[in-house]
């Protein structure tokens, strides 16, 4: 035996493989206020005990590796390791468990969602001992939250900038999403804003393609904004998508938007990446731009119930990284979204303090301290008949976005915008008068049709449209 080996042995190093649960499963651990807490849905491989699976998640997402290493003796594992501190079965699922893991705050770089996710959901999702793994929720402690800027402006500052109060904001995604020239695109923007919408929007995959380069689009959309503002007396905006192939190009586009004097830009935060998103968010705060966030690619990550990451985690990450709006499903439209679960992460986006509520999928109490809120955006397959439900579900602090539900109006874009604005104003007035939108919604819309031919035409076109498909990602215990 060499002297080196003898030295290592003499300080207690023992090579080999040992069970994770001997080090990382600590049911006696009392969580600290500064810990980041995670709730994982764990599906172990056959023969792997849930305690070992939960401990493996804690180890592989913090300080552990597959074998004992002598450099463990050069640090304090008790200080830095993740700990699986509780395991509970999932109701109705024999092979699934919720494993709760606590991570010491010093494991993470300040102000970096990128680093936080690299640790917590980095390698561990490919771990062979697990058949599947899903991150259901995170508790971000105030000590970590305070290292982030968060949304560039937040809900109240946005309302003050736009001078719009007491109702949801109305938007529209310009369709067809690809193929229009910049001038025709700007014309559609003008018609929608002139008809009564607050915002129009680039679709997520509108960047700078051969048929419409970004600079041309920005110029024609700015012209549409200023013309519609002059005619209506209302502040208008268009979400100019600054997403690009490099961070430098993205910022260049945001700079041009600022020079044009428009109020808001847009970013695809998952395809663009958290580092790019945080950089753009900082630029927007420094330069007075609102930031609209699209969640393109989210369903790749969050739709399957037993593997991936729930959208409530992506929503929390966005609030840290920064954005003033984010798409949050509709409950009633064409895209996936369970009602209680959606309302849970909508509250996590908007409110300062959210209590633990498992009936809405919220595993931890979340205190956002002074971090501004984010407006949830309801978008995808919605039309005027959905307006009462959307107003009731999302409340005033939201953006209701009708793409086909505006541009598909039989009389054109501007009448489509008029129909949506009239429907919204009717629902808000009825709610303020004490009427129940959930019960009387259709009647309220029919009454408004009597004095708005544009709304009457829209109601006739979409009276039979339904998206009656079951939700894939339901809360536990739901049939």
UniProtKB/Swiss-Prot annotation:
EC top class named in words: lyase
Gene3D superfamilies xrefs: Ribulose bisphosphate carboxylase, large subunit, C-terminal domain (3.20.20.110), RuBisCO large subunit, N-terminal domain (3.30.70.150)
Cofactor stoichiometry and binding remark: Binds 1 Mg(2+) ion per subunit.
Residues bearing PTM N6-carboxylysine: 201
Function: RuBisCO catalyzes two reactions: the carboxylation of D-ribulose 1,5-bisphosphate, the primary event in carbon dioxide fixation, as well as the oxidative fragmentation of the pentose substrate in the photorespiration process. Both reactions occur simultaneously and in competition at the same active site.
Active-site residues annotated for this sequence: 175 (proton acceptor), 294 (proton acceptor)
Cited HAMAP family: RuBisCO_L_type1
Catalytic activity: 2 (2R)-3-phosphoglycerate + 2 H(+) = D-ribulose 1,5-bisphosphate + CO2 + H2O; D-ribulose 1,5-bisphosphate + O2 = 2-phosphoglycolate + (2R)-3-phosphoglycerate + 2 H(+)
GO biological process, one term: reductive pentose-phosphate cycle
Record EC number: 4.1.1.39
Lyase is among the record's keywords: yes
Residues that hold substrate according to the record: 123, 173, 177, 295, 327, 379
Pfam families: RuBisCO_large, RuBisCO_large_N
Keyword Ribosomal protein attributed: no
Cofactor(s) annotated in UniProt: Mg(2+)
Underlying gene: rbcL
Name used for this protein in its record: Ribulose bisphosphate carboxylase large chain
Similarity field: Belongs to the RuBisCO large chain family. Type I subfamily.
UniProt PTM: The disulfide bond which can form in the large chain dimeric partners within the hexadecamer appears to be associated with oxidative stress and protein turnover.
Annotated Gene Ontology cellular component terms: chloroplast
Note in the entry: The basic functional RuBisCO is composed of a large chain homodimer in a 'head-to-tail' conformation. In form I RuBisCO this homodimer is arranged in a barrel-like tetramer with the small subunits forming a tetrameric 'cap' on each end of the 'barrel'.
């Amino acid at each position: 035996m060499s002297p080196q080996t003898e030295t290592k042995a003499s300080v207690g190093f023992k090579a080999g493989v040992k069970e994770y649960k001997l080090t990382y499963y600590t049911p006696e651990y009392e969580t600290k206020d500064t810990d980041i807490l995670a709730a994982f849905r764990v599906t172990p491989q056959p023969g792997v005990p849930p305690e070992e699976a939960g401990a493996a998640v804690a180890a592989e997402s913090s300080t552990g590796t597959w074998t004992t290493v002598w450099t463990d003796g050069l640090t304090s594992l008790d200080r830095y390791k993740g700990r699986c501190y509780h395991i509970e079965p999932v109701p109705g699922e024999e092979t699934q468990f919720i494993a709760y893991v606590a991570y010491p705050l010093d494991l993470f770089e300040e102000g970096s969602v990128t680093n936080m996710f690299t640790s917590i959901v980095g390698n561990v999702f490919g771990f062979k001992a697990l058949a599947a793994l899903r991150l259901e929720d995170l508790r971000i402690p105030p000590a970590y939250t305070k290292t982030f800027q968060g949304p560039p402006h937040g809900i109240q500052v946005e309302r003050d900038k736009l001078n719009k109060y007491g109702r949801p904001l109305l938007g529209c995604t310009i369709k067809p999403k690809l193929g229009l020239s910049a001038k025709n695109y700007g014309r559609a923007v003008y018609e929608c804003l002139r008809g009564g919408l607050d915002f129009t929007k680039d679709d997520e995959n509108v960047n700078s393609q051969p048929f419409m380069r970004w600079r041309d689009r920005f110029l024609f959309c700015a012209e549409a904004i200023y013309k519609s503002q002059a005619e209506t007396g209302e502040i208008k905006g268009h979400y100019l998508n600054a997403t690009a192939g490099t961070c430098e190009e993205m910022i260049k586009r945001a700079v041009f938007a600022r020079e044009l004097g428009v109020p808001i830009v847009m970013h695809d935060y998952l395809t663009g990446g958290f580092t790019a998103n945080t950089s753009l968010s900082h630029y927007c705060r420094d330069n007075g731009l609102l930031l609209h966030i699209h969640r393109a690619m989210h369903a790749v990550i969050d739709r399957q119930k037993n593997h991936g990451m729930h959208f409530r985690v992506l929503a929390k990450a966005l609030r840290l990284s920064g954005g003033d709006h984010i798409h949050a499903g509709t409950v009633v439209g064409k895209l996936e979204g369970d009602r209680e679960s959606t309302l849970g992460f909508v509250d996590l986006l908007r409110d300062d303090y959210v209590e633990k509520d498992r009936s809405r999928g919220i595993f931890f109490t979340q205190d956002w301290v002074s971090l501004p809120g984010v407006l949830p955006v309801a978008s995808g397959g919605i039309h005027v008949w959905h307006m009462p439900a959307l107003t009731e579900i999302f409340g005033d602090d939201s953006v209701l976005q009708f793409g086909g539900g505006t541009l598909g109006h039989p009389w054109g874009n501007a009448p489509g915008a008029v129909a949506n604005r009239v429907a919204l104003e009717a629902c808000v007035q009825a709610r303020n008068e004490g009427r129940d939108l959930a019960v009387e919604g259709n009647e309220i819309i029919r009454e408004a049709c009597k004095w708005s031919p544009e709304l009457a035409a829209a109601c006739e076109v979409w009276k039979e449209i339904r998206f009656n498909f079951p939700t894939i990602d339901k809360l536990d215990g739901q049939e």
